Amino acid sequence: MLCTAALAATCGLAACGSSQTSSSGASTSKRTDFVLGGLFPETGSLSYVAPAQMAAFKLAAQDINAAGGVLGKSIATTIADVSDADHADQNTAGLQSVLSKNPSVIVGNPSSGVVKNTYHEAEGSKVVMISNGATAASLSGISDYFYRTVPPDTVQGAVLADTIAQDGVQKLAIACFNDEAGNGIRDVVVKHLQSAGVDIVYGEKESFDPTEKNFSSLASSIKASNPDAVLVIAFDQTVPLIKSLSSVGVNTKHLYFFDGNMSDYSKTLDAGMLEGDKGTVPGAIATAEFRKRLKTIDSSLTTYTFSAETYDAVILAALAAQKGGSTDSGTVKDNLASVSGTDGGTKCTSYRACVTALKNGKDITYSGLAGIGPFNTKHDPSSASIGVFTYDASNLPQFDHSQTGKVS
């Protein structure tokens, strides 16, 4: 779920039965004020990823207004903090704050657990929610009103498992937190690795409490399982967990990570501690030009977690309203798939270019920064890239290669 500053510096990835056809007349009473809602984890275990996502959200709104807005009117924005899945009260409070502004769409949250805690209320209010980072496979097709600009864990999990197996690991231990995101990708990785003949010596079913602060017992259990390598699936628990593993003699140069903790550890861990370790990140890598533009919004940015996916979610929603001729959320819902390219049409790479094509009566395929394929019938991207990264001697992740996967 993450794309850090270091990653960016090196290279820039149950059907609900909803219709995939566009609907230019979805609303019986046309609305013309587009209100863009945002839900981001400004507090909690994912707070370090919020700044870049909020910057991308604001940059997309700025670009939309610079191109004439939606239906000729500038859009308004509203943002609320939803924290993480361990703070359900804040999940609800944040959502209700945004819903009170009568949004045309809500972009966020990047946490699968938070989405699980909030999508029902958004659906009940008939407001579209587009997640910029929730990857749990269980979210595919969960609601007519839920979309996402990242692929489900089935894609990243397969690439991560292939990376581990191709490195020759025979015995793998897994340290996984008990969270929707953690358990989801863990299960995908385990399935693929067992098919490849890799023995899961610890963590096939075990998981730790996300609020845990002391990892000495877990580290000792992993050490006792005598693994060749350890897959660490956690958020802000990662640093203390790695330190605990090191303290009991686990080789921290044989670790693997997923998007939730592929981060810059140059200031939090001793130099060389992660050298050679690998991990995967779904979605696109923020390009140098995009990073430069984001810094005009927030000059303090050092990590670019799902910033491209956030930007594209905003643009897609605005284009859906523009195509449908109304800014109510029902119209946005009914036109999202079409502007993503399910109907084919003129390829366009910016809001301005896409709006011009729509005004000329053309169908469009928005080809944005995230590089995803058109939405499928489960409201997932039909294809997406997964980046594979290797840590250098400074504990910075460096891009190695990417693999494009199709979403079933």
Model-identified regions with their sequence ranges:
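Extracytosolic ligand-binding ectodomains
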Residues: 1-408
